[in-house]
Amino acid sequence: METHLYSDLAFEARFADDEQLPLHLVLDQEVLSNEEAETLRYVYYRNVDSAGRSTGRAPGGDEDDAPASDDAEDAVGGDRAFDRERRTWQRACFRVLPRPLELLDYLRQSGLTVTLEKEQRVRMFYAVFTTLGLRCPDNRLSGAQTLHLRLVWPDGSYRDWEFLARDLLREEMEANKRDRQHQLATTTNHRRRGGLRNNLDNGSDRRLPEAAVASLETAVSTPFFEIPNGAGTSSANGDGRFSNLEQRVARLLRGDEEFIYHAGPLEPPSKIRGHELVQLRLDVNPDLMYATDPHDRDEVARTDEWKGAGVSRLREVWDVQHRVRLRVLWYVNSFWRSRELSYDDHEVELYRALDAYRARIAVEYVLIRAVRDEIYAVLRRDGGALPQRFACHVSRNMSWRVVWELCRHALALWMDWADVRSCIIKALTPRLSRGAAAAAQRARRQRERSAPKPQELLFGPRNESGPPAEQTWYADVVRCVRAQVDLGVEVRAARCPRTGLWIVRDRRGRLRRWLSQPEVCVLYVTPDLDFYWVLPGGFAVSSRVTLHGLAQRALRDRFQNFEAVLARGMHVEAGRQEPETPRVSGRRLPFDDL
């Protein structure tokens, strides 16, 4: 609840410069695993209009749309394009609650008022609370725009989902419109009743009956602490029914001068030797939100207003591909309800948005099909002759006809399973993130390695041969018998110094024996985008991932994973804005890790 309140205040503070409607989301075990929730580091979001353009893009030309070349570095463009693309993403604050909870009970325990039409039990093993922004330029919301959500982990891995604004807003906008109409009608009725009441008050002496006016005058003339007798007259007016003690008590309660204690010319009792006994509000809490003057009266804090109004609706929203389901909390006192936002939901724009979305996600399948076509092209070119490139002992009695059948079925199975988790995408992502600066850094490291060392100038080059250098590859393991594909497995590859064949190990240094299993085929992709389609026995089809026909912007939009962007509004607990040390998930992150 604190995360949502803080984010709502942050969105309200910068609404004039960046018009966004806050969406308060809750992610649970249906979206993330327990390990993913506990290690989550960054939450990013961006808005894409119906034409597929990221809103809020930095000004610049469209040189990004040039088709990519064979060289992956040419496909990524320069640092300027990378920086322009990075600005379209915004970072959101979040909080991880790593314990089981029931959502509505948790909100009530936090002090919120929950007024739902139909309450439902929402059990969560853990929860991630965050707030994303939906752009509304000129107070106009379009149901055809798309909200992209990206979760990033410390190792650089990330997951993306896309949500249509129509699914997020349609029911809430209709409900908010009904609430505003009901509130307007209620206010109008109160005004009518108030005007009628004022008219009665102004002419009460003329319209009320004479008996009622007489009784009203009698009640006003009678003191409050003097009890009337049965005849309607006061007993303190000389009828002798009350004793002298009772009369003195009545005068004491009435506040006569003789019963008031006067302290004399001393200071007021709230001061001792000139010092205030009661601390002012400004001394107790200098960050009090409504403290314009120390002697002003206390006003209701925004937190109390937020809790008192509470939650009005809880919605479940699916992403465009119906892979994950999020929950959206709509608060009564969220600032956007007073902005009179207009909502447009046109079918034509919705179809345009879906077409643009399909074009964006088609980039990964274009890459996958390009790799498959390249494998078949190499097989036709070489006439089916494959060299052994990976170390593996092969029996002489091995049936190669079965291997070729296995290759065909394995490729079809891999095509059905491959997605953004594939080894191709994992090898491509770092190159897109690094840009031209990374290319210059690699060239500098290569020059440093090739330059002669001081000891080599004095004593000559060393003849001793050290262990072979390992490279980090990614693999897609196709298990034909199980009809299962393990995507994006990270491995370590090094050449055997005796045979020159590749030896593959896992991250712990254990030898991978996939090639010795007759039902397994493996696709390896190197950081330079060279790939090996390996059959049982270590015989491989080798080539390069071609990037012809793909726009640079489409590549970056879909696969780019940039470093952390320092954004405002990251301090959940302290309520401050210090981008140097952002605090997320309840712990402070060192600046060196960003």
Swiss-Prot record:
InterPro entries listed in its UniProt record: UL17-like (IPR007640)
Record key words, sorted: Capsid protein, Host nucleus, Late protein, Viral genome packaging, Viral release from host cell, Virion
Localization per record: Virion; Host nucleus
Pfam families (UniProt xref): Herpes_UL17 (PF04559)
Residue ranges, annotated region (Disordered): 52-77, 176-205, 443-468, 575-594
GO BP: chromosome organization; viral DNA genome packaging
Ranges of Acidic residues composition bias in the record: 61-76
A Gene Ontology cellular-component term: host cell nucleus
Family classification: Belongs to the herpesviridae CVC1 protein family.
Assembly behavior: Interacts (via C-terminus) with capsid vertex component 2/CVC2.
Described purpose of this protein according to its UniProt entry: Capsid vertex-specific component that plays a role during viral DNA encapsidation, assuring correct genome cleavage and presumably stabilizing capsids that contain full-length viral genomes.
The protein's name: Capsid vertex component 1
